[in-house]
A protein has these predicted regions:
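N-terminal beta-strand motif that seeds the catalytic metal site of vicinal oxygen chelate
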Residues: 1-22, 47-49, 63-67, 114-118
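Vicinal oxygen chelate
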Residues: 1-4, 8-16, 44, 57-82, 84-118, ...
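Conserved active-site alpha-helix within GNAT-family acetyltransferase domains
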Residues: 19-28, 101, 110
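Short glycine/proline-centered loop/turn elements that form peptide/ligand docking sites
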Residues: 20-21, 38-41, 96, 118
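Short, intrinsically disordered, mixed-charge
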Residues: 27-30, 81
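Short secondary-structure junctions
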Residues: 30-35, 85-89
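Conserved short beta-strand elements that form part of the metal-binding/catalytic scaffold
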Residues: 31-63, 110-116
């Protein structure tokens, strides 16, 4: 089986208040807003995509790496075939229009892998 190409790479920051966080990044760093919603926002900084996700309180304040792919199932198959593991199985998040899973690479680094759904 061939490798699954990555369509977008992003760093995700968990935030408690989406509007406040977006205001901070746009006003402090003059970022270019690509997506702005209560469930997921993205801005572009020097070619890198930074994503903000609600839930940034308590133990959900981590920063994480994420990959957007066209075929989540194929990507997860390649993850396991190449020594990684699935730490959270695929699930649909209809409000965000994504199907998402979490994986660990061969070194234990956690990565979110998502596929856009309609």
């Amino acid at each position: 089986m061939t490798a699954t190409p990555v369509d977008k790479t992003y760093v995700m920051l968990m935030v408690a208040d989406m509007a406040r966080a977006m205001r901070f990044y746009t006003e402090a760093f003059a970022v270019t807003v690509a997506i702005n919603s209560p469930y997921w926002s993205e801005f572009v900084v020097a070619g890198a995509t930074i994503a903000l996700h609600p839930g940034g309180s308590g133990n959900e304040t981590h920063t994480g790496l994420g990959f957007e792919v066209k075929d989540l199932d194929a990507a997860l198959q390649r993850v396991t075939e190449t020594g990684g593991r699935i730490t959270s199985p695929p699930r649909d998040r209809q409000q965000e229009r994504i199907r998402v899973a979490e994986i660990a690479d061969t070194e234990g680094n956690l990565i979110t892998v998502a596929e856009l759904i309609n």
